[in-house]
């Protein structure tokens, strides 16, 4: 009897000890604030996944009649995501996590999670919802208003977007001690300031206009054959898909579609890129695909073990644009790559003997410099002028120095000053041409020229250890992508932009590489 009781007592004690161990283990896990934050971050990432795919659907395949209901749904989703990012307990978790022992990757993850949390918590939920609704309404209407050069109709919707964006900029400025525009820049280019951009762009303005004029004069005596005829959209798409294969795009985790404004969306495991086709020529859509494939390869190459956390995301939009412009400008317009494009284009359009598809002619088409109205169709040399114009306008708009109604006139003045073109009465090819401002993405435009500068710097560094031209000529670009993966893609947001660039190239941003690249390509 005593034995039974002792045995029974032992079993009970063992069960209690086991239970205590499990409870203590669970408590230890639950008390690990960093793990809580990572789990919560992945939850937010899943909803952002849905938002991104739905955004692609809206731009690429949604019928026009679905716009109003879609706007409501996306606004509701935005509010939900904002609610997740601003839950009260997160402040305590961040405070606790900062006292925990974390490795270098975990420290970077915590830093980036906290940065995004701080950016989200300053905005009231009502403003987030209002911005989503106003942005969706403005963007959808813009698609037809731009075609009709309807500034008056566009201005009515855009007024609300600008007002709400200015409110956001002011709130962020008060929370961070920055100027309103600097506070918006922080969303796209962490650590970059207006002062830095003013300095870099002011320098560009001292040499770019004269370089453009010299190159245009130099090319005036060169003959080339412009594409003429009919280039079916389905053939252009097939050509684009072949070029994407050459660039080693992962079709198991992405696809190509068509939209009014080319873009790269989706998520790293499901990247969606789009282009637009003009059946009277093939040049623009093809290089647009090369550009967006650069964005896509960066997304597909981000560190998978950090997926769902901010540290596993792209470092900045400038670095993102550096990858698309590396593909488009550094690789895509090189003589070795043009040879591949010429051969593939001739095959897909059944015109191998057409002089349009001769390598030297395609090379001239893709390095032709001319002053034009449209940013997305601009050549490599005039593109920075388009960006600087937009930067100066959005900077003054967010800082309250100008009104949104001033924009058409200011646009015309700056286009005349920088490119010698007037957009007076031609707003569809002026201030209405871009999608960015329709949803309040103020602060994004500088990323394009920063990206071009980073791309030139990356290429200069890469050529020290990689036979770039040899790899392109061979048709196996793996050595190029291996360098990008090792130095850029796999790093995600583990380092600041300056640290990332310095690790890859030995120095922080140096615009002289960009200037040297342009001089080498267009003056030699």
What are these regions (language model features)?
Residues 131-282:
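Contiguous, non-catalytic segments that form substrate-binding/exosite surfaces or channel walls
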Residues 33, 52-55, 65, 69, ...:
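C-terminal, non-catalytic "cap/extension" segments appended to globular domains
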Residues 3-4:
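Polybasic, lysine-rich low-complexity intrinsically disordered segments
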Residues 313-353:
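Post-HExxH zinc-binding segment in Zn-dependent metallohydrolases
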Residues 18-30:
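Short, Lys/Arg-enriched N-terminal segments with co-localized hydrophobic residues
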Residues 284-300, 321-325:
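Active-site recognition of the HExxH zinc-binding catalytic motif
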Residues 30-190, 519, 523:
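A well-structured
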């Amino acid at each position: 009897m005593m034995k039974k009781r002792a045995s029974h007592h032992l079993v009970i004690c063992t069960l209690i000890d086991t239970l205590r161990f499990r409870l203590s283990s669970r408590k230890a896990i639950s008390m690990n604030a960093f793990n809580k934050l990572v789990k919560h971050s992945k939850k937010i990432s899943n909803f952002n996944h849905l938002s991104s795919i739905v955004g692609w659907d809206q731009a690429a395949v949604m019928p026009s009649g679905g716009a109003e209901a879609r706007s409501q749904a996306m606004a509701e989703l935005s509010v939900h995501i904002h609610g997740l990012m601003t839950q009260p307990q997160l402040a305590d978790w961040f405070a606790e996590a900062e006292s925990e022992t974390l490795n270098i990757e975990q420290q970077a993850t915590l830093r980036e999670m906290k940065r995004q949390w701080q950016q989200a918590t300053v905005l009231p939920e009502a403003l987030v919802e209002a911005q989503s609704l106003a942005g969706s309404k403005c963007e959808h209407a813009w698609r037809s208003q731009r075609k009709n050069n309807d500034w008056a109709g566009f201005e009515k919707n855009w007024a609300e977007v600008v007002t709400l964006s200015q409110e956001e900029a002011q709130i962020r400025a008060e929370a961070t001690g920055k100027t309103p525009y600097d506070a918006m820049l922080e969303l796209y280019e962490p650590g970059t300031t207006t002062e830095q951009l003013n300095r870099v762009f002011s320098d560009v303005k001292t040499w770019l206009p004269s370089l453009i004029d010299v190159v245009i004069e130099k090319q005036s005596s060169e003959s080339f054959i412009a594409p003429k005829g009919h280039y079916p959209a389905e053939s252009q798409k097939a050509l684009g898909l072949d070029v994407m294969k050459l660039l080693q795009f992962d079709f198991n985790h992405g696809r190509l579609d068509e939209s009014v404004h080319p873009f790269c969306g989706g998520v790293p495991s499901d990247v969606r890129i789009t282009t637009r086709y003009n059946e009277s020529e093939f040049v623009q859509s093809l290089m647009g695909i090369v550009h967006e494939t650069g964005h896509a390869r960066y997304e597909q190459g981000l560190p998978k073990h950090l997926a769902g956390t901010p540290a596993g995301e792209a470092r900045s939009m400038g670095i993102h644009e550096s990858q698309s412009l590396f593909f488009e400008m550094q690789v895509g317009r090189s003589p070795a790559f043009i040879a591949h494009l010429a051969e593939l284009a001739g095959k897909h359009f059944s015109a191998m003997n057409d002089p349009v598809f001769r390598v030297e002619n395609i090379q001239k088409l893709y390095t032709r410099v001319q002053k034009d109205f449209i940013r997305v169709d601009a050549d490599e040399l005039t593109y920075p002028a388009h960006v600087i114009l937009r930067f100066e306008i959005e900077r003054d708009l967010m800082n309250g120095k100008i009104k949104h109604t001033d924009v058409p006139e200011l646009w015309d003045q700056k286009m005349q000053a920088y490119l010698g073109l007037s957009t007076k009465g031609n707003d569809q090819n002026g201030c209405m041409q871009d999608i960015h401002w329709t949803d309040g993405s103020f602060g994004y435009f500088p990323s394009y020229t920063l990206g071009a500068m980073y791309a030139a710097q990356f290429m200069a560094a890469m050529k020290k250890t990689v036979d770039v031209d040899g790899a392109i000529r061979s048709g196996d670009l793996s050595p190029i992508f291996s360098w990008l993966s090792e130095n850029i893609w796999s790093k995600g947001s583990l380092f600041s932009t300056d640290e990332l660039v310095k690790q890859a190239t030995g120095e922080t941003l140096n615009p002289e590489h960009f200037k040297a690249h342009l001089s080498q390509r267009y003056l030699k």
